Amino acid sequence: MTTVNAPEFVRHPKLIAWVEEIANLTKPAKIEWCDGSEEEYQRLIDLMIANGTMQKLNQEKHPGSYLANSDPSDVARVEDRTYICSQNKEDAGATNNWEDPAVMREKLNGLFEGSMKGRTMYVVPFSMGPLGSHIAHIGIELTDSPYVAVSMRKMARMGKAVYDVLGTDGEFVPCVHTVGAPLAEGQKDVAWPCNPEKYIVHYPETREIWSFGSGYGGNALLGKKCLALRIASVMGREQGWLAEHMLILGVTNPQGEKHYIAAAFPSACGKTNFAMLIPPAGYEGWKIETVGDDIAWIKPGEDGRLYAINPEAGFFGVAPGTNTKTNPNCMATLHKDVIYTNVAVTDDGQVWWEGLSKEVPANLTNWKGQPHVNGEKAAHPNARFTVAAGQCPSIDADWENPAGVPISAFIFGGRRADTVPLVSEAFDWVDGVYKAATMGSETTAAAVGQQGIVRRDPFAMLPFAGYNMADYFDHWLNLGAKVSEKAEASGNKLPKIFNVNWFRRDAEGNFVWPGFGQNMRVLEWIIDRCEGRANAVETPIGFVPTYEDLNWEGTEFTKEQFDLITNQDRDQWVTEIESHTELFNKLGERLPKALKERQAALLEAVKTGF
């Protein structure tokens, strides 16, 4: 039997008993209680270098930075192996995979039995959100992966201080993770242990997360998507708040007015770039600051405003396509202390990925550890960097404010080659919820499967909602109604809701909108709409700006180009709105009536209004 030996700073009997229970099941060779110290971090890094899991990069060019290359079978989230095991199948809904919790527990008990043999179990305490914030929640992850332990130190508030907040009886979300590769005595380990069989399982009622077989970020860093979205969305519904797949940014104009915006885009649609946007020429005196690039927890305040925190402490960003032109702030964030995964490396120990430079360096080693062959990808399309958010030059002064920051507007956007205009404002909260509920995006490399097909991704939460999607829509509608009453009483108003699409293409298939820093022009219009300053034209699908309503100083983007990405085609929109029925039918009886009514009204407006 493995000895638990909890250190003095752990004073929580229930937690200690749980660690003992999991140790008896998984049978690790030893248990290590992580304290989050620099010494511990370096020791685990050195251990992984010795094991071949990580390599030290050129310390002049990449001080404190390391590279891990995963097994080629373990490179992305595995949505088809991700389960919501609610007691009642209906509570998981048609967009989630469900298994009876009793059946799943039996299955997982079999898989986890002895799964950590020959390995160390790391007890990783973490807070999602600033320590002690009323919006924050604590998790404890038990993992046999040192890669997870060091990554969690960057991605969450990880360490001894968590136990001070937890005390002797504080609540925590129990997270169990194994790579599913036990070692027999004397057996040599591989560089990236994993198992062909993978399960990422959530039990919403008991707030448990169990992950088997994968060492990759989203499947193994259980504070991220598993706790911060799937479990937290269930908690939010019960407690009256939102857990969302959203970036949060602050915008300050030259007059010193500041607004915070939360924006939801599916994975690999530019959340990190937008969160770290640098205003273009013509926007001197404007400032964009970053609160978060991926997840927002949003709670109603007493004044009827919605306040958001970034529950994470780091960025787990997609490397390919990131460079000093597309995201200078991100590149500056990567100046030191980064864990890279599945990027390529030069012969002098510098990282490289597609899009970092036009020229492909000579003598490159690809993400599989082999010499790079021209015409093949040197870095995996879903290669990642893990870095502390505090290193970002555009980080907002209030990014760790335990009270959160007040949200003025929500933006929703997907990757669409046609139909959806550059920007539109919803008529009201219900209309905005409808647009977010039916947003579509072309699939990307962040999830396993086919690329380039339009799929409905409601609120960019399709892979992340921890309960029935129809109930999730209902929660948004109800929250809006409740907060609206409170806001009016305090002289405030609900955030406005906008849709954007940076990805319209011309007849030749090229992107028309330059994107990146130029998205500031759309952002300025959005803020001015929140302030009641900007003009717009009412169309059947919302309020849209004319060419003259946007600020074009410092650019030569023409009216003809603008018309290409804002024109609305009646037939395309009829097809679009009719195609929403497929999602609505899938969601069945629980779909809020207000959304069916909105669809009918929108279809009528589009048929007669264009």
Curated annotation (Swiss-Prot):
Reaction(s) the record says it catalyses: oxaloacetate + GTP = phosphoenolpyruvate + GDP + CO2
Cofactor note: Binds 1 Mn(2+) ion per subunit.
Compartment(s) of residence: Cytoplasm
Active site: C269
GO CC field: cytosol
Pathway stated in the Swiss-Prot or TrEMBL entry: Carbohydrate biosynthesis; gluconeogenesis
Name of protein: Phosphoenolpyruvate carboxykinase [GTP]
Source organism per UniProt: Acinetobacter baumannii (strain AYE)
Gene, per the UniProt record: pckG
